[in-house]
Amino acid sequence: MASPRSVPTPFPARSATGGLAGYAEQFAETEGYLDFARFGPPSRDVLDTTRQLLEQSARADAGTVDELMRQELRARQAAARLLGDVPPAGVALLPNTSTGLFHAAFGLPHGTVLVPAREFPSNAYPWLRAARLGRVQPVSLEPDAYGRVTPELVRQALTPETVAVSLSAVDYRTGYRADLGGIREVIGPDRLLVVDAIQGMGVADLPWTAADLLVTGGQKWLRSGWSTGFLYASPRALERLEPTLTGWTGVVDAGVLDSQEHAPAPDAARFSLTNLSPVTAGAFAAGLELVLRTGVDRIQAHIAERTAQLIDTVRSAGGVVLSPEAEHERAGIVAFTMPRAEPAVVAANLAEQGVTATVRPDQLRLSAHASTTLATVDRVHRALTSLPV
């Protein structure tokens, strides 16, 4: 039973001089919001889809559950289109990035995996837990002096025991974009490349299918809300990874409830543990479809412009930018320090000007999106130039 369409969420329009026209109108975050690397406020489409599906579930009849469950395929199809030439069967939905990384870690029975030092903890704990069970062992890979994990560093660290490399496509601290194509080339066809794409998916044009196992969440740059995400598995990953964590929905003939163990599904469905919420699947589909309609290239270009403006603003105020200099090496993150002020003091000034940023003990992080306005950059300028001398 289809529910009547809800009244669309009334968001304010954005001017063309502010956010990206045709995209920014979907959003209602406050001016000054620069924390997309932590959480991306969802779009009107995501909110409306969530409301519609919940209303549909509230009027449940004999066909409601089956109809709602079709949202899972809709989301997988959208994710496959975003990745490029990928079949939907190569995609499985996830509730978060960590779940996908646990599938990778527990799927490798032996050998070593290179994991960059100072990675986000979600790319550390799965390998540590697997190692304690006697499976694959993590080996720390130290970045260069600029915090980069380059193909040459990876090449030098490879040993005959290395079975995989696991890293973030975009570093959460600095916004550095990993050279996925170069790393894929140096590790060769006999090792797996595991990629956490959460800080770049939908906003950075990277060769995503260089990864054998790619995982991402939808709550940051894809702006689809929490408990959303997907996994892409290449044919090589499906061949090499043991389906250790496969649940009842990840097997052949999952709907046949005969109390027998079924074989794992032949495609990415084998990474399913159980049914996920069709409401969040529909919301995720709506978020992905908005990115597809807008175009990653347009979103990326707007973010690059705002990021460059933020970098200039920080430097003009005497700040030290920790993010990469070259535009092709950075995404939407600007990490910086102010030599004459502690991060907590800078954070207080930013907050006074209505700027939302990530504050860490040793640095601050600004992250702009395609809805970020010039007025937001001006707020940062006022905050940094009014610091006490």
PLM regions and their residue ranges:
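Pyridoxal 5′-phosphate
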Residues: 1-389
